[in-house]
From Swiss-Prot:
UniProt source species: Klebsiella pneumoniae (strain 342)
Positions annotated to bind Zn(2+) 3: 73, 101, 131
Sequence positions that bind Zn(2+) 2: 15, 40, 194
UniProt remark on cofactor binding: Binds 3 Zn(2+) ions per subunit.
Oligomeric form and interacting partners: Homotrimer.
Protein name: Probable phosphatase KPK_3500
GO process annotations (BP): bacterial-type flagellum-dependent swarming motility
Transmembrane spans: none
Pfam family, one: PHP
The keyword Hydrolase appears for this protein: yes
Keywords: Hydrolase, Metal-binding, Zinc
GO MF term (any one): phosphatase activity
GO cellular component, one term: cytosol
Top enzyme class: hydrolase
Length: 245
C-alpha cells in the first residue's frame, strides 16, 4: 500500500458520494498519511463553483495526523492547453491536475489530443495529467512522456480506469508507464475515488507498473515527503504542518 493518494472526488462533484470527513476517517483507518481532494473543474456540468476551490483555505492542513492537500482535477479545454483553473484558484491550490473529459473537450484525433495535452503541460500550471491512457483520447505516448519529463509533470496511472471507467485503458497505460520509465519522468497513482471506500486502492495500478518493471524511485506516492518535494520543486510553498509527515 502507498501512503499517498492524489485523486479523489467529494460530494461537491455531485456524481461522487463522500465528504471530506469521510475521506479523513478512511485515511486514518487505512494508514494513508496524505491525500488530495481534487473535485472537477468548474466547466464540468456538475462541478463545484470556483468559490469551492478558493475557500479550501479554511481547511485544516492536518487532522489526526493525516495531511490534506487542496487540489482540482481541471479540464483541458482546447488545443492551446487552456484549463478551467485560473486567477485566485491557481494561487489557492496545492495540486493542479488536468485531463480530458468528454463534456468539455469532445474526443477528436490523436494529433489534436497530443497537442492539447503537451500545451497544458508547457503552460507551467499543471502538476499532473489525469488518466492519460483513456482510449477515447488517443495520444502520441512517447511524445507525451518526453514532454512530461521535460516540464516535470507527472502522468497518472488511474486505478479506476481498470475497474469502473475508461474501459480498455490497460494497453495504453502499460505503454505510458514504459515510456515514462524510459524518459526519466514521474508517475502518480490515483484511486480516482468517488466514494471513500476506494481511497488508497492501487491494486490494478501496481499490476501495470510491475508489467514494465517501473522503478519505485519514480513513483510520487511512495512517501509524503517525495510528493511534497516534487510539488515544492514546482513552486508550491513549503507547508510547515507537513514537516513531520
Amino acid at each position: 500500500m502507498y501512503p499517498v493518494d492524489l485523486h479523489m472526488h467529494t460530494v461537491a462533484s455531485t456524481h461522487a458520494y463522500s465528504t471530506l470527513h469521510d475521506y479523513i476517517a478512511e485515511a486514518k483507518r487505512k494508514g494513508i498519511k496524505l491525500f488530495a481532494i481534487t473535485d472537477h473543474g468548474p466547466d464540468m456540468a456538475d462541478a463545484p463553483h470556483y468559490w469551492h476551490f478558493v475557500n479550501m483555505r479554511i481547511w485544516p492542513r492536518l487532522v489526526d495526523g493525516v495531511g490534506i492537500l487542496r487540489g482540482i482535477e481541471s479540464n483541458i479545454k482546447n488545443i492551446e492547453g487552456e484549463i478551467d483553473c485560473s486567477g485566485p484558484m491557481l494561487t489557492s491550490l496545492d495540486l493542479i491536475i488536468a485531463g480530458f473529459h468528454e463534456p468539455v473537450f469532445p474526443p477528436q484525433d490523436r494529433d489534436t489530443h497530443t497537442q492539447a495535452m503537451i500545451a497544458a503541460m508547457a503552460s507551467g500550471k499543471v502538476h499532473m495529467i489525469s488518466h492519460p491512457g483513456n482510449p477515447k483520447f488517443p495520444v502520441d505516448i512517447p511524445a507525451i512522456a518526453e514532454a512530461a519529463a521535460r516540464y516535470q509533470v507527472a502522468l497518472e496511472i488511474n486505478n479506476s480506469s481498470f475497474i469502473s471507467s475508461r474501459v480498455g485503458s490497460e494497453d495504453n497505460c502499460r505503454a505510458i508507464a514504459a515510456a515514462v520509465r524510459d524518459a526519466g519522468g514521474w508517475v502518480a497513482l490515483g484511486s480516482d475515488s468517488h466514494t471513500a471506500f476506494t481511497l488508497g486502492e492501487f491494486t490494478e495500478c501496481r499490476k501495470i507498473l510491475d508489467a514494465v518493471d517501473f522503478p519505485e524511485e519514480r513513483i510520487l506516492n511512495v512517501s509524503p515527503r517525495r510528493l511534497l518535494n516534487f510539488l515544492e520543486s514546482r513552486g508550491m510553498p513549503a507547508i510547515p504542518e507537513f514537516a513531520d509527515l
